Every structure is written in C-alpha cells, then in structure tokens.
A protein has these predicted regions:
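Intracellular loop-helix junctions on the cytosolic face of multi-pass helical membrane proteins
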Residues: 1-32, 171-172, 198-297, 316, ...
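Glycine-rich segments within core transmembrane alpha-helices of 12-TM secondary carriers
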Residues: 102, 175-203, 210-221, 225, ...
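A membrane-interface helix-boundary motif in multi-pass transporters
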Residues: 87, 200-216, 327-332, 360, ...
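Transmembrane alpha-helices of Major Facilitator/SLC transporters
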Residues: 227, 294-324, 337-345
Length: 457
C-alpha cells in the first residue's frame, strides 16, 4: 500500500519511533540521528577536503604513483576514454569517480535495507565499512582499495539514515521539512569541523594524520548509533510486509515526477561538487589567502560552506514560516537553488576578470560560498523531504537511494568538468559552470506547474 502527502497512515503499516518524549518539539530519535550523521559527515568531508590536494601535491607524483596498487590500470582505462591525463586532470577524474560512486551505491543500500537486512543493520554495516576505509587511507599503496571500501560503506549508510529521519514523523506532519533542515545542520556541523581538524592535520603534520582523524570520527558516529536503537523507528518488518504491494496510479505518477527532476538536480550537484575539486585549486593557486597577517590554509575554505549552512538554516526556515501561504513550493525552491548557484559562479567570473591573472582576494571566495550556500539550502533539504513525502512507502529506501544518485551523476560531471581547468581560461571555466546551473534552474522552473498536482506541492 502506498501513502502520499495529505494522507495519514496507520501504525500497522508505518513504522514509528518509540514514544520517549519530544525534544525541542521533535522526537528524541532525531537527536541521535543528528549526531550519527554529524560524525559520518566529519569523516567524509575531512577526507574530501584533502583528497585533490593529496593527489596533486603528493600521491600522483610519478615516484609515488607507481606504488599505488591498481592505479596504473585505472589510469589506462581513463585515458582510453578521455585521452592522455596529466596530474591535475587525473586527480579531478578520480575525485569525480569517488564522489559519484558514493552516491550510486545507495541504490543498492536502499534495496538491501528494504528487502534483506532492515535499515538499522544496514546503517551499522555501512558505518563499519567507512571507518575501515578511512583508516586504510593512511596507507598510500591501498589508496584505491580504501576508496572502494568507502564507496560501499556510504552506499549502505546514506539512504537509510535519511529515511529514518522521515520515519519519525507522520506523512502529513508539518515538522518534516524543518526536521530535515535540522538534520542538514548536523551534516554541515560535521562538515565544518572536518576541514579544520582533518585538513589542518593533513596539511601541517602529514596527509595520513588527516585521514586517520576521519576514521576516528566515523568510529564515534558508529558508537552513537549503536546506543540510539531504543529511540529509532522499528521499520524493517513494516518494509517486508509491504514488499509485494503493487503500485497504484498515484505511486507511478510520483515516481515519474521524481525522475523528471533527476537530471536538472544532477546538473546542480555537478556544479556544486567543484567545491572539493577546482575550487580547491583556485584557492591554492589563484587566491591571496592572507588576512590579518595570517595565511589561511587551503582546506579551511572547505569549512565555509558547512558553517554558513549551520548559520543560515534558522533564518531560511524562519523565512519560510513567515511566508506561510506565500511560501514557494518545494519544486520552486529547487529552481531558486540552481539560479543562486549560477550567480555564485558569476561572482568568480568577475573575480577572475578583475584580478587579471594575479591572485584574487579571498573575499571573493567568501561571497561565493555565501551565495552557493543559500542556493544549497533551497535545494537539498527540501528535495530530501520531497522524496520521503511522495515515494511509495514500500520503496522508500530504494527511492531515496535513487534520488541520492543525482549526486552520482553530479560527481562524474564534476570530475569531467574539472579536466577543463588547466586548458580553459579561468573566467571562461567559471562562466561555463554558471550557464549549466542556470539551465538546470530553467528546466526545473518549467516543471513547477505540471508537477504541482502530482506532488500535491
């Protein structure tokens, strides 16, 4: 049986968290999921902050690259498709493959939870794999194997922790959007701390210290989740009961609606993921990082986006509450997010032109992150909430995995676009990114009216 927005569901068919009292207006389970996700994102973004710099400045040096098991064959495969790759384009492609594949495997993770293990055990499996993968990153010859373990672990973890947040609330509970925004703060609190801790350790003490710190963070998240069980939804059996339920017309319409939004959202993530790719290189090679007599470490710029999400979320949520009947629909918010991302890259076009080939002020990057962050807040948490509201109940984890696969396409696109960094002018490169994001926003805008009835948005 499928349940959609505006319809209530009975306790027999929808898993609900045990009654343990609300905390600040939300179920206690949200607090534990918040903390677990915070530490998981600490580990992910700690490694992400270092990844491109580590490859460009250290690992892909010809004297070291030969020691990495499997790298020669992997590079040959990439060059067969894309042609010869120097160090920077190769690093961008590896970054793109990693950031893409960590969001493809959630489809399998959602299926595993829905049909085999249940969400709790799948989350535990994923967290354990990721902890192991981060510690493996400390050994450079295991680099590709470590990335593979991290990819598999993320696939098991990511869709199911997000789905459990939605399962804490009835489908018509107006707290759902704010719950995902709060959950998103947890994501970005961990992502903010990660570059400051892992990035500093990696840049100042050695790359492997930064990767080991990421492993410690994931281990802490796993421990928190193991203690959280009494507060979380008991949904594994409910999923099995609904496994063979046929889809009705409304269910198919909801799935088609989500798939129509898939491509433009994927384009957004391809532009967004330049933060950990070419934006790192812009900060390292083309930015004057001196402020008050102090040179800002390159990895610290990766802390700006999550810090701003942490700071801006309460104001965005308050704005939506004040608008009430005038609040943009979920799909309209997603379009606004894409247009703001385009504006962010137009700012970098201006910075590249004004600097005239010299080092641009770090303030340009700061303003870029402000605009991009607001755009992300309009798109990402609202789209996650949309999936949990309209996806058929018995396919919820799988559809969450499919939706997270927008970042799979985006990750590959980010890697491919990054290969043009060395060959294009910097104003031309950033203008290309702005145009792609604006086209994504236009495509979503054209879908607002057709999808309004289907999504009841």
């Amino acid at each position: 049986m499928c349940y959609h927005r505006g319809m209530s569901a009975s306790p027999a068919t929808v898993a609900r968290a045990p009654r343990g009292g609300d905390l600040f207006g939300h179920p206690r389970g949200l607090t534990f999921l918040f903390a677990t996700e915070m530490w998981e994102r600490f580990s992910y973004y700690g490694m992400r902050a270092l990844l491109v710099l580590y490859m460009v400045k250290y690992l892909l040096d010809p004297q070291r690259a030969g020691q990495v098991v499997g790298l020669g064959a992997f590079r040959s495969a990439l060059e067969f498709v894309f042609g010869p790759l120097d160090v920077q384009p190769l690093a961008s492609q590896i970054y793109g493959f990693y950031t893409g594949l960590v969001y493809l495997t959630p489809i399998l993770g959602g299926f595993l939870a829905d049909r085999v293990l249940g969400q709790r055990r799948t989350v535990i499996l994923g967290a354990s794999l990721m902890a192991a993968g981060h510690f493996m990153m400390a050994f450079e010859h295991l680099f590709l194997f470590a990335l593979g373990v991290l990819i598999l672990g993320n696939g098991a973890f990511k869709p199911n922790i997000s789905t459990q947040v939605g399962s804490l609330y009835a489908l018509d509970d107006r707290r759902r959007d704010s719950a995902f925004s709060i959950f998103y703060v947890g994501i970005n609190l961990g992502a903010f701390l990660a570059p400051l801790v892992c990035g500093t350790l990696g840049e100042e003490l050695g790359w492997h210290y930064g990767f080991a710190a990421a492993g410690v963070g994931m281990t802490i998240g796993l421990i928190i989740y193991l203690f959280a069980a009494p507060t979380l939804p008991r949904d594994a059996f409910a999923r099995r009961e609904a496994t063979h339920a046929p889809l009705d017309r409304t269910g198919w319409q909801s799935i088609v609606a989500l798939l129509l939004l898939f491509l433009p959202v994927s384009l957004f993530w391809g532009i967004y993921e330049q933060q950990g790719n070419t934006i790192v290189l812009w900060a390292s090679e083309h930015t004057d990082r001196h402020a008050l007599g102090f040179e800002i470490p390159v990895t610290w710029f990766q802390a700006l986006n999550p810090f701003m999400i942490f700071a801006f979320t309460p104001f965005i949520v308050a704005l939506w509450r004040r608008q009430r009947a005038r609040e943009p629909s979920t799909v309209a918010k997603m379009a606004i997010g894409c247009f703001l991302a385009a504006l962010a890259y137009l700012l970098l076009v201006t910075a590249a032109v004004v600097s005239g080939g010299t080092h641009a002020s770090w303030l340009w990057l700061f303003v870029y992150f402000v605009v991009l962050t607001v755009g992300e807040l309009y798109l990402s948490p609202t789209s996650l909430s949309l999936v949990t509201k309209v996806a058929p109940l018995h396919l919820l984890s799988m559809m969450m995995g499919v939706w997270l696969a927008t970042s799979f396409i985006g990750g590959f696109l980010a890697g491919y676009l990054g290969t043009f960094w060395s060959s294009m002018t910097k104003p031309g490169f950033f203008l290309m990114l702005a145009i792609i994001s604006a086209l994504a926003g236009l495509a979503i805008t054209l879908l607002i009216r057709p999808l309004r009835v289907v999504l009841q948005d």
